């Protein structure tokens, strides 16, 4: 899908609602599926990722009935016999959350996926499974696991994706004995770990930090059904937030002020860049401001990386983004992808491992003659849309359908802000 994105002749400004948090929705769906009884999850966006988790839940242990923006999940209290692989589409969260849960089913479980999903590293789980003499077979065609995890002590690196830690958090409390997760410092993305724990607590399963690097997971617990409302998503709100910080006149609604979402850091980052905004309840309104580059640590908020690279181009001075290594292992190599596309627009930036240096150069940005590549990556496409609107460039972008992965309504929702999108 090839589209051209440009700002409206009337300028940028308006109100946009943050879509439901994809991270929280994944967690709520799985907790509901593992419960015995009916849970009602409200404020859902049926992106490809969330649809993959809902389908997997229905295949494994739940009856799922979806509405326009909600889902009733009836946990069956037992696992169903599998007759086909579990298709995780391109969702890393779906796959990594479900691998430990699969160990509870008493049967071999094969996972399949699309895009780069089966190329993404799973060595954390592979090591744990091999240590317990369990089956773990990964190939480009799929991943098969078999055998039951045992309660006990688990040691794993704290600077890997928190999805591995969350996957163990889902499954281990259901085992008959206590378990401890010993995280080798540094512990990154702690906010995502605590988000998992908070959603679990809403469904009656509890864990606690014994110290800064050790989690106690009491065994013999049971998930209980509940009604759960999903918060607005700060990682997605980052796109209109950067647009608002540059252009002004943008209000984002649905952003809980007391959130556990690590990507809420976008507001602090923008404030440090000189952004001017006010908060009233769950709404944040931006005024136009002169922005300057800052030093940014992505360790706890890696999903912000692509749009922060765009922000850096539109700030005065230099922006340095550190601890961005994990961007190379997403739906695309996001560092390489964004470097290529931003340079095509006249951007000046370079990377060294996990450090990205972006030089403010708004005055030299231009629309290239050839289309930009979306790299089949939703965050790359949405970041390029922000660049087009904020810099006043008509940019043609391919792979625009990649937004279906996380925010299917992104282009339609951004239209009232003055972001025009047409088929190219």
Task: Label every PLM stretch briefly.
Residues 1-424:
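Short, structured segments at the rim of ligand-binding sites
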């Amino acid at each position: 899908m090839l589209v051209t994105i440009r700002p409206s002749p009337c300028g940028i400004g308006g109100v946009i609602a943050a879509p439901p948090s994809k991270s929280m929705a994944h967690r709520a769906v799985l907790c509901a599926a593992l419960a015995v009884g009916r849970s009602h999850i409200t404020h859902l966006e049926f992106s490809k990722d969330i649809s993959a988790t809902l389908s997997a839940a229905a295949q494994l242990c739940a009856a799922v009935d979806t509405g326009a923006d909600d889902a009733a999940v009836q946990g069956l209290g037992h696992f169903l016999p599998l007759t086909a692989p579990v298709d995780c589409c391109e969702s890393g969260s779906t796959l990594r959350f479900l691998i430990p849960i699969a160990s509870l089913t008493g049967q071999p479980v094969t996972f399949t996926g699309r895009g780069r999903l089966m190329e993404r590293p799973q060595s954390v789980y592979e090591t744990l499974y091999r240590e317990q003499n369990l089956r773990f077979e990964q190939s480009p065609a799929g991943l098969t696991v078999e055998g039951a995890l045992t309660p006990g002590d688990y040691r794993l690196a704290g600077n890997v994706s928190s999805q591995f830690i969350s996957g163990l958090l889902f499954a281990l409390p259901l085992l008959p004995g206590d378990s401890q997760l010993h995280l080798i410092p540094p512990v990154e993305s702690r906010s995502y770990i605590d988000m998992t724990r908070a959603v679990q607590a809403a469904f009656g399963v509890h864990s606690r930090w014994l110290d800064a690097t050790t989690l106690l997971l009491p065994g013999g617990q049971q998930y209980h059904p509940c009604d759960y409302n999903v918060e607005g998503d700060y990682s997605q709100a980052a796109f209109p937030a950067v647009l608002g910080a540059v252009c002004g006149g943008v209000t984002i609604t649905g952003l809980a002020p007391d959130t556990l979402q690590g990507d809420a850091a976008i507001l602090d980052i923008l404030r440090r860049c000189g952004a001017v905004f006010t908060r009233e309840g769950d709404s944040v309104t931006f005024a136009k401001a002169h922005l300057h580059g800052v030093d940014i640590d992505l360790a706890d908020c890696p999903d912000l990386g692509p749009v922060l690279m765009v922000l850096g181009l539109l700030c005065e001075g230099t922006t340095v983004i550190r601890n961005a290594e994990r961007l190379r292992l997403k739906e695309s190599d996001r560092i390489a992808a964004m470097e290529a596309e931003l340079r095509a627009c006249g951007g000046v930036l370079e990377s060294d491992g996990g450090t990205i240096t972006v030089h403010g150069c708004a005055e030299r940005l231009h629309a290239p003659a050839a289309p930009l590549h979306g790299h089949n990556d939703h965050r790359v496409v949405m970041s390029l849309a922000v660049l087009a609107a904020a810099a006043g460039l008509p940019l043609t972008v391919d792979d625009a359908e990649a937004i279906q992965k996380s925010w299917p309504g992104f282009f339609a929702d951004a239209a009232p802000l003055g972001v025009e999108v047409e088929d190219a």
